[in-house]
Amino acid sequence: MARPLEQAVAAIVCTFQEYAGRCGDKYKLCQAELKELLQKELATWTPTEFRECDYNKFMSVLDTNKDCEVDFVEYVRSLACLCLYCHEYFKDCPSEPPCSQ
């Protein structure tokens, strides 16, 4: 049985592969693919009042090489930043883990 971290890594890779390629390059997310991924896979963490300009801004932050797409490295960096944010947020919480083991 896979451990939680192994499952998390597989989920990161599989989620990227599920959404990438609909606009062309199967190794990158275009803005529409990124928007759909955020809305469906991080629905509780993506504000419902996000406007198109918010997605444009988010895309420009993630797209570090400015090719108008998010490659896997840029995607993983964004998830790493999200993990860092969550770690900071939860580090002063009670010692009970936020998820069951």
Swiss-Prot record:
Superkingdom of the source species: Eukaryota
SUPFAM superfamilies reported for this sequence: EF-hand
Residue pairs linked by disulfide bridges in the UniProt entry: 30-68, 81-99
Effect after changing residue 81 to A: Increases affinity for calcium
Alphabetical UniProt keywords: Acetylation, Calcium, Citrullination, Cytoplasm, Disulfide bond, Metal-binding, Repeat, Zinc
PTM-bearing positions, type Citrulline: 51
Residues that, per the record, bind Ca(2+) 2: 63, 65, 67, 69, 74
CDD domains given in the database record: S-100 (cd00213)
Effect listed in the UniProt record for changing residue 30 to A: Abolishes calcium binding
Entry keyword annotation includes NAD: no
GO cellular component: cytosol; Golgi apparatus; plasma membrane
Effect of residue 68 to A: Abolishes calcium binding
Keyword Cell inner membrane: no
Region forming the signal peptide: none
Residues with N-acetylalanine modification: 2
Binding site for Ca(2+) 1: 28, 33
Compartments where found: Cytoplasm
Similarity-based family: Belongs to the S-100 family.
Its job: Binds both calcium and zinc. May be involved in calcium-dependent cuticle cell differentiation, hair shaft and hair cuticular barrier formation.
Self-association state and partner proteins as the record states: Homodimer and homotetramer for the citrullinated form.
Name the record gives this protein: Protein S100-A3
Source species: Homo sapiens
